[in-house]
Structures are given as C-alpha cells and as structure tokens.
Curated annotation (Swiss-Prot):
This is Cytoplasmic envelopment protein 3. It comes from Human herpesvirus 6A (strain Uganda-1102) (HHV-6 variant A). The gene is U71. GO terms for cellular component: host cell Golgi membrane; host cell plasma membrane; membrane; viral tegument; virion membrane. A lipid is attached at G2 (N-myristoyl glycine). GO terms for biological process: viral budding from Golgi membrane. InterPro entries: Herpes_UL11_megaloV/roseoloV (IPR020170), HSV_CEP3_betahv (IPR034705). Plays an important role in the cytoplasmic envelopment of tegument proteins and capsids during the assembly and egress processes. Also participates in viral entry at the fusion step probably by regulating the core fusion machinery. Its main location: virion.
Amino acid sequence: MGAKCCKPVSCGMCKKTENTLIDYKGNPILLANEFTVLTDTESEEEGMADLEKPLLEKVVAKCDTEAEKKLPCKSKK
C-alpha cells in the first residue's frame, strides 16, 4: 500500500530519478546518506574462526573428561 502511494508522489515531485524514496512529509530519502556501504567481511570471518578454534578445543576436552567420569572403570586383571 505504501509503495502505491509513494510512487505517484515521487514521480510528480522529482523527475530526475525514477526510484526516489519519499518519507511521510514528502521529502526525498537518500539512502547513500542514511546507510554505509557494506564491505567484504571475508577476512574478519577467517579471523573469527581462528579465535573460535581454541574455545572449541576446550569444550571438546571438557566433554571428553566428563564422559570418562560417567563411564565405569575397567579393572585390570
């Protein structure tokens, strides 16, 4: 419903750009000013994986020791 209402208003007010967003007061919204451009975060994700690895190793070690405590001990004959 909002898109149907805003499109005729934006086409009538600003002929320079076809896809202009208009707020409820009729002012054009420039997305470049409102939001920052997303950058490639691949290197950050790789860095996080390096940080998570030691934590996972600690969790696995803790689970292994708890599992050993629950198992019955085998006696040597």
